[in-house]
Amino acid sequence: MRLLFFFSILYTASLCCQLKDFLPCVMQLSAQKVDFNMNPIEVIFNITTEAKLMHTCRTYSRILPCFDQKMVQCGKPSEKTQLERGKRLHSYLCAPFSLQRQKIFLRRSKCIQDVLAEPQSSVCNRNDTVFADKLQSCREMCTRPDCVSKIELSEVSTCTYINIGKKCTAEAAQFFAQMQQVLTNKEYPMQCQYDLRKKPESELKKGLPIESLVAQTTSSTTYVTVHPPALPSVIDGVVTRTSLPIMRRTDPNSKFKPRPTTSQSNGPVIKTVIVDERGAPMNQPTSTQKPKVVHKFLPNPYTTKNPNTLKNDIIRTTRTIIPVVDKHTYVPWNYKVDAVQVSTLTSALAPVKPTETVISSPPVAFNFKLPAEQTSTQPFRVEINWHDDEVKQEPTKAPGVFVSPWYLKTPSHIPPEIEFATPTPLISSPLEAVSPILSQLKSNSLNFTELGNQANNYFSAALSAFAETKKEMAHNDPWRTIIDAVAPTIHKFSPDVIPRIREEINRIQPHQQKN
């Protein structure tokens, strides 16, 4: 579309630039099948689709430098101005930021073209519009014959603008006006000179203010003329017309001369004076408002080297380790020594486990001697004889009732394999019985699977022998003592045996009570 506008420029510039100079540019337009015309508005409104608009914009973007080069070679200033107008119109419709304007153009171009095809006149209803005031101002300010033609053009343009707004919406009218302003770089539709600024109001009447007939206590304004002392026209050898101090000193002795402290005033000074009924000035009441106290920034509060711990801090606790005299020392799980349970074994082999009940006295220490390693893992029956001699049936108080060889009559007798004793807290090594196990742990030769099998065999044999006893047992049953003493060790090495022991005890005890 701008190519057509440029061809109109070429027609006017043919006196300086020949047509053959622009022939390469015209050939490029023909190759791209872009129409051209002397009227740029007609070229613009012949575009009806978005694809054609994009094609025209791309073609102009490539060909405009060709016209610029030719204008630099043989163009006049007026011709260059026409080319600049075409560039502005191209930017208005084809710039990357003109997408909204392109949409408006594609929607309203057909309606605008229909309005422009009609005959234009200067007669239309301009009431209630700003154009009426502007045209009236143009007529009042027009004092030359050439401004009359501009007024007539403005009348026609305003009617065109109003008709487009009525038939094609106000959006189309604003778009058409903006396009004309970009093309001519002037206001549209007004083309004449006008001035709508309000005239300044008449100056206020000078003189003293009118006072009321009834004098009352009020705040009146009085005009007081202050005449400052005459100032010398020459200060330090420099003529000045202002009251600003002169920074440069031309006279070396001028620093001893006093400086004027009163600024020069040409007009009267207005002061507000509070008067009473007689017209005498009254003293203004003093303000009781206290001045604001400005608190300067205080230093940071003093902080100690040991600040308070936060609520969420975790208080660390220390564990007192009992000095170990013997490396084989072991404290049973249910024995409390200084509220700390310590084990010489590693955590994986002998973990420290708390219990719900803690006894006050030390438990019964025991020495459990393991037999030689066995190759057979099958359970076997063991008959335990507490005496080396033959079993003698000793009569009891009841006739026909004899003492069982498996029942320990005197507590002073100590079996050869299992020894019972009540140790004191001062015993140096309460775990002498497990010294072989500790030695095997250090040498990494202990087989826990075989040890568990041996423990199962021993307890199976013990329970079998214990089940054959049908006599009533005393309250201090030695088998119960054995089980209580050996249970922690069995629980540590073979925990699966404990439920079996409990089942056997529960099965045997009711049977003993019946007998």
From Swiss-Prot:
Q: What does this protein do?
A: Plays a role in promoting resistance to bacterial pathogens such as P.aeruginosa by inhibiting bacterial intestinal colonization.
Glycosylation site residues: N46, N127, N447
- The reply to whether Signal figures as a keyword in the UniProt entry is yes
> Region (Disordered): which ranges?
248-267
Entry superkingdom? Eukaryota
Keywords attached to this Swiss-Prot or TrEMBL record, sorted alphabetically, are:
Glycoprotein, Secreted, Signal
Q: What is the name listed in the Swiss-Prot or TrEMBL entry for this protein?
A: Protein aaim-1
Where is this gene product found? Secreted
Tissue-specific expression:
Expressed in the terminal bulb of the pharynx and the posterior of the intestine (at protein level). Expressed by intestinal cells and secreted into the intestinal lumen (at protein level).
What organism is listed for this UniProt entry?
A: Caenorhabditis elegans
Up-regulation conditions: Up-regulated following infection by the microsporidian pathogen N.parisii or the bacterial pathogen P.aeruginosa.
What results from gene inactivation?
Answer: Resistant to infection by the microsporidian pathogen N.parisii and displays a fitness advantage phenotype, whereby there is increased fitness following infection by N.parisii. Fewer invading N.parisii spores following infection at the L1 larval stage of development due to impaired orientation, location and angle of N.parisii spore proteins relative to the host's intestinal apical membrane. Does not affect the ability of N.parisii to invade intestinal cells or N.parisii spore consumption by intestinal cells of L1 stage larvae.
Q: Where is the signal peptide?
A: 1-16
**Example GO biological process term?**
regulation of entry of bacterium into host cell
